[in-house]
Regions:
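Glycosyltransferase-associated regions of secretory-pathway enzymes
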Residues: 1-71, 87-156
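Small-residue hinge/turn detector
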Residues: 73-84
């Protein structure tokens, strides 16, 4: 039987910052609010610890300097491989995530109850996060005559 702590979302905050530029003050002010999360480790994902050779989607978006799309992939990869909570840099934390750590995963909702990607929490190896991550293996990036930015390899 697993210990209770092993069956929780770990106290790790992940965030992505690609492009090498300094973080603007307004975003740093948001990141600074994360300090209320006592006992949490913060992991930054950037050019120093990402390979950009994960799949065709990552290679192409990196080559075309589409940094936001790169973050879409690496937020999922970080949460899948380490577990923890991904936060966009414009997220202000007002209270602890501790009450959510017993769940297998959680996502934020935005506007009209659409699922957002600014906050993603999950245990290491979570199958939902894996399924979302695997979608990028079947996604190409680029525009075509229809104006699509993304396209599934089966043409949908």
């Amino acid at each position: 039987m697993q210990k209770k702590e092993e069956n929780k979302i770990p106290k790790i905050i992940h965030y992505c910052w690609f492009g090498g530029k300094p973080i603007p003050k307004d975003l740093q002010d948001c990141i600074d609010t994360w300090s209320i999360l006592k006992g949490y480790q913060v992991m930054r994902w950037d050019e120093s610890n990402c390979s950009f050779d994960e799949n065709e989607f990552v290679r192409k978006t990196y080559a075309e300097k589409q940094l936001g799309f790169i973050g879409d992939y690496y937020r999922l990869k970080a949460v899948y491989e380490y577990g923890g909570i991904y936060l966009d840099t414009d997220v202000k934390v007002c209270k602890s995530f501790d009450p959510l750590l017993d769940y297998p995963a959680f996502l934020n909702f935005i506007f009209d109850c659409s699922v957002g990607s600014a906050i993603i929490g999950a245990r290491k190896g979570n199958p939902l996060i894996k399924a979302l991550l695997d979608m990028y293996d079947n996604t190409t990036f680029g525009t075509n005559r229809s104006g699509k930015v993304f396209e599934w390899r089966d043409g949908k």
